[in-house]
């Protein structure tokens, strides 16, 4: 009997994190949340969920799959009653891809129902989980997010806010949360502000979202970013801000600008698209090469390639065409089929590549498998030279703050020098933007090792938040990413 399993046709990029969306006080809350999640689909494709509240009762639907599949049934949408809603798109960084891990999670407390969606990773979740189990907690999922609910249940404070604050003071890691309770919606960012969260307004309604592109799709006006370490409460009287977690050095994830965020979003008052163009221009200044055409690896490489071409004077061309309708493919995953998998997503445009010296621009190299196939594809299309330029520094370290990265030993840049990597992928030359060049593109003079303005741990190994579970040699990989020898 033939068993078919899904494989990812693009397994050589860092995987997106999760998406958050919430709206308070709108008659079409569920429908608008679906639209917001559509705009944020790039941040998580494994599962999607929505929880609504009509003031007293909560309604929920969660399922594995894309937003369009999960919420396609009009009859289902009519069951999601209420004027407030929160939604979540999931790409798992902790816990299996099963329905019980799909967010927003929902629990009943003595004060009423409470739903929560999480983007990020709690780096002491396994330690806390073990402590809570010893105290009698019964966990229903394998995601780190559930830890917050049990900490709230154990909290001594009486109000919802008291319990949330007491719970979050015990967790470590990178997180943005959007929560829904009776009569209120809550947004929180961790003290280092690693993961994004923005606040918007639609008429008399307030909106929370991971990115501004989700505000745009529903016509909401951007108000501001939720600040690092800030907790906002949205209720019938408006938006209230508190800062209960003390101060910490802000370290927003720089990879949001390189790859994760949608290019039409603005994060921390910066245009993502313009940041990528500037990165490409800086890359051209640092690593120019004689060539006939600059070609992006679509879609993530396009803005950087435009910036590279403009700075270098080498013409830009769409030498690789992407098929946007292919992702995980359910066919027999033989080696031959896997080798063809990249062609399901990318195909060389031989009409503009033949006889050309080509500069390929991509955002990153993780394992090197996709880069190898794309270089080969471009050569087969008739390119006489292939030079690879990467709009991020070499990824030498794993991320423990909400990005699904391979263990360190599987990262190509951890194992090889740049020259060895060029040989591995079959390129005539390979260059990455320097870490100082990346910071220059972001408006800084250089990276200040004593006080970096971003989290760049995947490049530098400088982790701004404790890796408690990893450091204690955690041995249950299904519960946490905090150890590097997981299967």
Sequence positions of predicted segments:
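Active-site proximal loops enriched in glycine and acidic residues that flank catalytic Cys/His/Asp
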Residues: 179, 189, 210, 236, ...
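A conserved beta-strand->alpha-helix junction
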Residues: 141, 146, 316-327, 424-442
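Amphipathic alpha-helical
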Residues: 147-159, 298, 310-328
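Short, glycine/charge-rich flexible loops or terminal/linker lids adjacent to PRPP-binding catalytic cores
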Residues: 313-358, 369, 396-406
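Phosphate/diphosphate-binding loops
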Residues: 166, 214, 221-222, 226-230, ...
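Flexible loop/turn segments at secondary-structure boundaries
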Residues: 28-30, 93-94, 124, 194-195, ...
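Conserved short alpha-helical segments that host acidic/polar catalytic motifs at enzyme active sites
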Residues: 1-228, 233-291, 297, 385, ...
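PRPP-dependent phosphoribosyltransferase catalytic core
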Residues: 168, 183-184, 201, 219-225, ...
């Amino acid at each position: 009997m033939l068993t078919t399993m899904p494989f990812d046709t693009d397994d050589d990029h860092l995987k997106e994190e999760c998406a958050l969306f919430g709206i308070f006080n709108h008659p079409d809350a569920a429908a608008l949340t679906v639209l917001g999640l559509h705009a944020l689909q790039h941040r998580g494709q494994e599962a999607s969920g929505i929880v609504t509240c009509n003031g007293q009762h909560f309604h929920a639907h969660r399922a594995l799959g894309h937003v369009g599949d999960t919420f396609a049934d009009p009859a289902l949408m009519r069951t999601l009653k209420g004027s407030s809603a929160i939604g979540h798109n999931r790409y798992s960084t902790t816990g299996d891809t099963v329905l019980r891990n799909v967010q927003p999670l929902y629990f009943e407390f003595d004060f009423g129902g409470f739903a929560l969606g999480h983007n990020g990773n709690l780096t002491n979740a396994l330690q806390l989980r073990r402590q809570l189990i010893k105290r009698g907690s019964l966990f229903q999922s394998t995601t780190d997010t559930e830890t917050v609910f049990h900490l709230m249940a154990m909290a001594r404070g009486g109000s919802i806010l008291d319990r949330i604050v007491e719970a979050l003071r015990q967790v470590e890691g990178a997180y943005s949360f959007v929560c829904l309770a009776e009569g209120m919606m809550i947004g929180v960012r961790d003290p280092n502000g690693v993961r994004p969260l923005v606040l918007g307004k639609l008429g008399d309604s307030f909106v929370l979202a991971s990115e501004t592109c989700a505000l745009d799709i529903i016509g909401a006006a951007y108000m501001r970013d939720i600040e690092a370490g800030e907790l906002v409460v949205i209720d019938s009287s408006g938006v209230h801000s508190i800062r209960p977690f003390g101060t910490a050095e802000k370290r927003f994830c720089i990879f949001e600008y390189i790859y994760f965020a949608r290019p039409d979003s603005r994060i921390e008052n910066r245009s993502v698209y313009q940041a990528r163009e500037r990165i490409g221009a800086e890359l051209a200044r640092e690593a120019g090469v004689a060539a006939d055409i600059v070609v992006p690896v679509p879609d993530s490489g396009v803005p950087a390639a435009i910036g590279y071409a403009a700075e270098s004077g080498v013409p830009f061309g769409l030498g690789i065409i992407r098929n946007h309708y292919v992702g995980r493919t359910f066919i027999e995953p033989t080696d031959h089929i896997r080798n063809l998998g990249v062609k399901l997503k990318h195909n060389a445009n031989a009409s503009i590549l033949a006889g050309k010296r080509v500069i390929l621009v991509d955002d990153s190299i993780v394992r090197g498998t996709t880069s190898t196939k794309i270089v080969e594809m471009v050569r087969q299309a008739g390119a006489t030279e292939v030079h690879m330029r990467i709009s991020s520094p070499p990824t030498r370290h794993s991320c423990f703050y909400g990005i699904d990265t391979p263990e360190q030993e599987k990262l190509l840049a951890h194992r090889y020098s740049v020259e060895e990597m060029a040989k591995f992928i079959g390129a005539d030359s390979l260059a990455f933007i320097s870490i100082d060049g990346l910071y220059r593109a972001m408006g800084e003079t250089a990276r200040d090792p004593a006080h970096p303005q971003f989290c760049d741990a995947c490049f530098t190994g400088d982790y701004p938040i404790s890796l408690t579970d990893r450091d204690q040699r955690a041995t249950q990989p299904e519960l946490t990413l905090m150890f590097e020898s997981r299967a």
